[in-house]
Regions:
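Active-site loop/oxyanion-hole signature of alpha/beta-hydrolase fold enzymes
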Residues: 7, 41, 51-97, 106-108, ...
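Alpha/beta-hydrolase fold catalytic core
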Residues: 1-23, 44-48, 83, 87-88, ...
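Conserved hydrolase catalytic core segment
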Residues: 88-131
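Conserved serine/cysteine hydrolase catalytic core
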Residues: 188-264, 270-273
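Catalytic histidine-centered segment of alpha/beta-hydrolase-like enzymes
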Residues: 274-290
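Flexible "cap/lid" loop of the alpha/beta hydrolase fold
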Residues: 115-168
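Conserved catalytic-core motifs of eukaryotic protein kinase domains, centered on the activation segment
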Residues: 35-37, 60-66, 129-131, 256-257
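Conserved HGGG/HGGXW glycine-rich cap/lid loop of the alpha/beta-hydrolase fold
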Residues: 10-63
Length: 303
């Protein structure tokens, strides 16, 4: 399994499995390359999968973000992966953060060398705008972004620390309360708040349950998302490849209407609705995901 040199001199881990046409799959926030394996297993004889661990996660956990724009940072790493493996005529897939990274690549440089793109449960515009209310958290964005701002302010007071679990108890209590509010708001389950508040006070539980446990990484992602991110909608009009969009119709993070609006921008888009799924269709409807992934890999029958 190679560690790929990237432009800042670090080495990013990329798991490579299978044989055949190349497929580059970009992970969501906190996801490890190994999480893809059960779903790609049926296709290893026809496709060669390149599965990176993004900076800060999996076997790339030791690599820090090196710029304020996390989306641009990950995009540059993806460019370096493509160049290192000499990928061309390849399939590209991205879920959540990986989807934003792929759309960032399309906006900045285009999807050159990509034959088809699979986009999984991510809005083409994370921040709400006067003409767009389908960003992260939808109509509750101001409320939940306010809580994320408070968490960011708290972390700004502890930049000398490495991990959130190292913060003083009073600060951990405040962070846990804010995280519990955010989680309850995301899921629509207010009864979770007292449970999560107590659970997350423990340093060990903070590290175990949070996808981001480092202070610097958490601050970077909070800034990226609360800042509104990027608007990738209009760049999709020039997207040169067919796009398949997998939508969790019960997604608590991104309104299905906003995800499906990709078809209003991309010249060649196909929408796949996962009616029983939230933000992670591969976990909520795994059999359907494997089946639809196969259709994407082999080229969907369009009609």
């Amino acid at each position: 399994m190679p560690f790929v040199p990237v432009r800042d001199g670090k080495s990013l881990y990329v798991r490579v499995v299978g044989r055949g046409q190349p497929v580059l799959m970009l992970p969501g926030l906190g996801m490890h390359s190994v999480h893809w394996l059960p779903f790609i297993l049926p296709y290893l004889n026809k496709f060669r999968f390149y599965l990176p661990d993004f900076r800060g996660f999996g076997k790339s956990a030791h690599i820090r973000l090196n710029q304020a724009d996390v989306f641009h940072n990950h995009m540059e790493d993806v460019q370096d992966i493509i160049a290192y493996f000499h990928l061309h005529d390849f399939l590209l897939a991205g879920i959540s953060l990986g989807g934003s990274t792929a759309l960032h690549l399309n906006k900045e440089f285009g999807l050159h060398g990509v034959r088809r793109y699979l986009h999984i449960d991510q809005s083409p515009c994370v921040g709400n705008r006067p003409d767009w209310n389908h960003g992260l958290f939808g109509h509750r964005q101001d409320e939940l972004f306010g809580q994320m701002h408070r968490l960011g302010d708290l972390l700004d007071e502890h930049t000398a620390l490495t991990h959130i679990g190292e913060m003083p108890l009073s600060a951990r209590r405040e962070a846990a309360a804010t995280l519990a509010e955010i989680a309850a708001g995301m899921t629509g389950k207010p009864l979770l708040k007292p449970v999560l508040r107590q659970l997350l006070i423990s340093p060990g539980q903070l590290t175990r349950w949070l996808p981001l446990s480092r202070v610097d990484d958490c601050r970077a992602y909070l800034r990226a998302y609360v800042g509104g991110g990027h608007d990738y909608r209009h760049a999709l009009r020039q997207c040169p490849v067919p796009v398949t969009v997998m939508v969790g119709m019960k997604s608590p993070l991104y309104a299905p209407a906003g995800q499906m609006a990709i078809a209003d921008y991309a010249p060649d888009a196909r929408i796949i609705r996962f009616h029983k799924s939230g933000h992670v269709p591969l976990m909520d409807e795994p059999l359907k995901f494997v089946r639809e992934l196969g259709l994407f890999l082999n080229g969907p029958v369009r009609g």
